[in-house]
């Protein structure tokens, strides 16, 4: 049998031109079971499947075997496969998965024998649930990832598919630290190779802007950007840019990083910075990026995460690839250099609240969590709603049929909506009018996972400074609308609640979905009984969206939908004024305490709870509704100390 030798070079053969010292050979076998005891299948990918196996020696060492799906034309092609070629050209490194042997079976299928680690980074994140890693653990993981990337880039390669699934992890003996190794070099390319490259590059959530905008040239900065996305996910256990498609991915990036133009980035050093080439690439695709102000990563985290860690994210997640640091420079960043959170400048009260140095994040709804398995790039981790009512509501809000407007065509005149990014911070109010003058960007995708924007706005509410001069009602102790129609609605609902044995005090409650549909368009309020029942069933599932407080749980539902249908039809023919409808939306939501008693809060300021928005309209979430309701004199008020996620409308 002819032997095809292969080996791992001990020197940098890419730039020195020296030939590596070959020490091993590609071996033939009838079946891989002949050489190893295959235990079980542990993973399946685009190019191959991974199996857990043990050697047939007394020591029974555990290994991982990647069996390639594509058959080889001849044995010599084994070392020409991109993954094998990349691993052979890279010298052994403690943060790169080691390759032990290469076998070809009788069917000419290649089997790569590698070292086995306990799990990958995605599995680790999924098992942590609401138990985030400590600051020291995140530092250690990111430091090892940067070391592995530095080794890959120094040897003239870039990975192109950096994602949590391709980061292998094993716990050390003390269980507080991890051994991290980069794996899966099936998409790796040499830095000095010429384009065009293969079309499939990286998983969308970790894909750099130059890849999304179809730039013909890209290099190692795509790995740095992906590392920044993973750093956020390691710390918060949630992805930062969970896009449904490439267009939605760009929107979420603009939502957090801001638009890559000079006008939007006129806010200092925060954000993704300016990238002039982005507009050129977008025009080639026939799209126009939204105009949004960037967010400050320092505002998204509590001490000590808001300092060195936030600074690292802002440097890694730059629009312009040339402005991202190299892997070697990343190792010199303050976050990777410090071994303890000694750089955190915070008050004693803040330090006492964060003694375990964990990320301070709000509760994530169960509907926003990531499923247990995701093995392919195109497999969606989002389960969008298909409700007929929500589709009508989408159409009523934006009226768009395409995710982006064409840059060369004049769009129809529409009302300018406030950018979510500008509502986020009062610092951006001065430039909000200038950067939101373009056509309102499409509504956020259905049931999107939480992003930093959702996390921050979860501790905020929308409040209106509109003063009510209407007389107080004796029974309800709240302002009543002035129109005869709304008075009739209140009387009808009062009669229904007084007849209810479970209600001790009368309170008007209407479906929040019905109220909002009335606010948008009278035609949308004429719904079938089936659609209303479907919407009511969504509200009945409220317990799984807000389990934080057992003493105060909001309840949003409609009373006797059949009896209300006639009133809704009459409203469609002669709707009241816009402000009167807003009063109906604000004042028909009640508060239910732990004993089941329904009471209506009396408060001069009108507010819409973030929990109400998240629960009753998962299609839009907080971020979209905040800009679409266009309440008079609306502003963002910080009530994070009062846990407004469990409060309801007065």
From Swiss-Prot:
Q: What keywords appear on the UniProt entry?
A: ATP-binding, Kinase, Meiosis, Nucleotide-binding, Phosphoprotein, Serine/threonine-protein kinase, Sporulation, Transferase
Q: Which family does it belong to?
A: Belongs to the protein kinase superfamily. Ser/Thr protein kinase family.
Polar residues biased stretches: 536-556
What name appears for this protein in its UniProt entry? Sporulation protein kinase pit1
The cross-references to Pfam families, in alphabetical order and at most eight, read: Pkinase (PF00069)
Task: List the GO terms this entry assigns under cellular component, sorted alphabetically.
Answer: cell division site; cytoplasm; cytosol; nucleus
Catalytic residues, chain numbering: 161
Compositional bias (Basic residues) = 403-417
Q: Which residues form the Protein kinase domain?
A: 36-336
């Amino acid at each position: 049998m002819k032997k095809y030798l292969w080996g791992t070079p001990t020197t940098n053969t890419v730039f020195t031109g020296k030939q590596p010292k070959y020490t091993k050979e590609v071996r033939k076998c009838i079946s891989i079971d002949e050489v190893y005891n295959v235990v079980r299948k542990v993973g399946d990918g685009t190019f191959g499947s991974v199996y857990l196996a043990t050697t047939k020696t007394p020591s029974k060492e555990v290994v991982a075997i990647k069996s390639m799906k594509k058959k080889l034309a001849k044995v010599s092609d084994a070392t020409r496969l991109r993954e094998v070629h990349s691993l052979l050209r890279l010298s052994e490194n403690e943060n790169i998965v080691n390759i032990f042997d290469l076998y070809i079976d009788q069917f000419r299928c290649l089997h790569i024998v590698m070292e086995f680690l306990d799990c990958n980074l995605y599995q680790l994140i999924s098992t942590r649930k609401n138990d985030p890693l400590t600051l020291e653990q995140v530092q250690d993981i990111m430091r090892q990832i940067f070391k592995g990337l530095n080794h890959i880039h120094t040897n003239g390669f870039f990975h192109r598919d950096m994602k949590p699934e391709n980061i292998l992890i094993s716990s050390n003996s003390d269980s507080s630290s991890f051994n991290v190794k980069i794996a899966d070099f099936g998409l790796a390319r040499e830095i000095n190779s010429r384009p065009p490259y293969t079309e499939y590059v990286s998983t969308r959530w970790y894909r750099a802007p130059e890849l999304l905008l179809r730039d013909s040239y890209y290099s190692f900065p795509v790995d740095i950007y992906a590392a920044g996305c993973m750093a956020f996910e390691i710390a918060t256990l949630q992805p930062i840019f969970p896009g449904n498609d490439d267009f939605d991915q760009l929107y979420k990036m603009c939502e957090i990083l801001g638009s890559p133009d000079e006008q939007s980035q006129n806010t200092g050093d925060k954000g993704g910075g300016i990238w002039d080439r982005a507009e050129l690439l977008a025009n080639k695709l026939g799209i126009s990026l939204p105009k949004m102000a960037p967010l400050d990563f320092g505002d998204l985290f509590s001490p000590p995460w808001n300092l060195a860690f936030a600074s690292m994210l802002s440097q890694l997640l730059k629009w312009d690839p040339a402005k991202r640091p190299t892997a070697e420079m990343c190792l010199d960043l303050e976050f990777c250099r410090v071994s303890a959170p000694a750089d955190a400048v915070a008050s004693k009260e803040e330090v006492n609240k964060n003694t375990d140095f964990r990320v301070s994040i709000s509760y994530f709804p169960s509907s926003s969590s990531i499923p247990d398995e995701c093995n392919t790039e195109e497999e969606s981790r989002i389960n969008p709603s298909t409700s007929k009512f929500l589709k009508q509501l989408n159409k009523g809000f934006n009226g768009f049929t395409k995710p982006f407007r064409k840059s060369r065509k004049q769009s129809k005149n529409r009302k300018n909506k406030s950018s979510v990014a500008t509502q986020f911070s009062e610092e951006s109010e001065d430039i909000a009018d200038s950067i939101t003058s373009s056509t309102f960007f499409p509504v956020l995708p259905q049931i999107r996972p939480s992003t930093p924007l959702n996390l921050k706005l979860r501790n905020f509410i929308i409040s209106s400074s509109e003063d009510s001069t209407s007389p107080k009602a004796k029974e309800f102790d709240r302002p009543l609308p002035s129109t005869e129609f709304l008075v009739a609605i209140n009387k009808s609902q009062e009669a229904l609640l007084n007849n209810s044995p479970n209600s001790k005090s009368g309170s008007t409650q209407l479906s929040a979905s019905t109220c909002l549909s009335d606010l948008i368009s009278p035609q949308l309020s004429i719904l079938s009984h089936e659609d209303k029942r479907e919407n009511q069933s969504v509200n009945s599932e409220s317990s799984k969206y807000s389990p934080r407080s057992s003493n105060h749980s909001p309840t949003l539902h409609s009373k006797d939908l059949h009896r209300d249908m006639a009133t809704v039809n009459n409203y469609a023919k002669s709707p009241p004024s816009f402000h009167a409808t807003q009063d109906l939306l604000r004042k028909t939501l009640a508060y239910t305490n732990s004993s089941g008693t329904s009471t209506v809060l009396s408060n001069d300021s009108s507010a819409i709870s973030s929990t109400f928005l998240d629960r009753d309209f998962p299609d839009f979430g907080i971020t979209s509704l905040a800009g679409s309701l266009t309440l008079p004199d609306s502003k963002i008020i910080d009530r994070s100390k009062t846990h407004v996620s469990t409060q309801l409308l007065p």
